[in-house]
Amino acid sequence: MDFVNHLNDRLLFAVPKKGRLYEKTKQLLNGSDIKFNRSNRLDIALCTTLPIALIFLPAADIPTFVGEGKCDLGITGLDQVKESGIEEIDLLMDLGFGGCKLQVQVPEKDRKYTDPKQLVGKTIVSSFVKLSRDYFQQLEEEVLGKPVDKLSTKIKYVGGSVEASCALGVGDAIVDLVESGETMRAAGLIDIATVLETSAYLIQARRPQQDKSREELIEVIKSRIQGVLTAQRYVCCSYNTPEGNLKELLKVTPGRRAPTISKLDDDGWVAVNSMIERKRKADIMDELKRKGASDIMVFEISNCRV
């Protein structure tokens, strides 16, 4: 990592080097025109389109590097930010991917535990020790009705294969991330409580940016990423309609700010262009058709600035 000391003219952007967030982060950077070439042996890649150096790190380490000011920006899970306990971090943007839940899971077979309060005083296995400890401390205080100085629940750290802990007798329950739930069910576990809902975030150190040009570059990056996220969420809908139907149709397609309305070279007709939510496009097109619109088309938005 000595190479970093020679990158003073570049913004340092920490991103996951592998794992569940890696591929989506690469796609987001590519969509933001943050292009780079990465050698298989290096955890640093220079951006070819902007003065940025990408620093590839384990997702769990990114809050530390950003919080201590070693990197200017980072992408990691909210779970990792909370687990780090570093308060000097600003959550700039929810990136909308990597969504999952940090959940308390117990063996399904005997249904011995149905409420997390039943686990007070037991052994909990997790790779999220801080979040687990904070959660069970709160439970203990609720059960006892008073502040707890020393936790009676034992929190045991395991770095991987956490879901095997109950079957092997390492713990009574686990606290682990659940995305689809397939791994949990395959291990014979069920969830009984959610500790945290998490997704990937763009993060920044909570300190004044001394370099104005770097501050401006951060704003460019934020704008580009927001543009990609907006383009993923919306499509452009275009249709023609008699002016008499316009008022009702605009209730269906109000747009992000307002629709674009143009007169056609046909008396009494107008063309409407409006951004609509991608997930609702089929329903919106059906409703437009029912209310008298014609020539209804939907176009992809490859990128935008909002």
From Swiss-Prot:
Pathway: Amino-acid biosynthesis; L-histidine biosynthesis; L-histidine from 5-phospho-alpha-D-ribose 1-diphosphate: step 1/9. It comes from the Eukaryota. Pfam families: HisG, HisG_C. Its EC number is 2.4.2.17. Keywords: Amino-acid biosynthesis, ATP-binding, Cytoplasm, Glycosyltransferase, Histidine biosynthesis, Nucleotide-binding, Transferase. HAMAP family: HisG_Long. Belongs to the ATP phosphoribosyltransferase family. Catalyzes the condensation of ATP and 5-phosphoribose 1-diphosphate to form N'-(5'-phosphoribosyl)-ATP (PR-ATP). Has a crucial role in the pathway because the rate of histidine biosynthesis seems to be controlled primarily by regulation of the enzymatic activity. This is ATP phosphoribosyltransferase. The lineage of its organism: Eukaryota, Fungi, Dikarya, Ascomycota, Saccharomycotina.
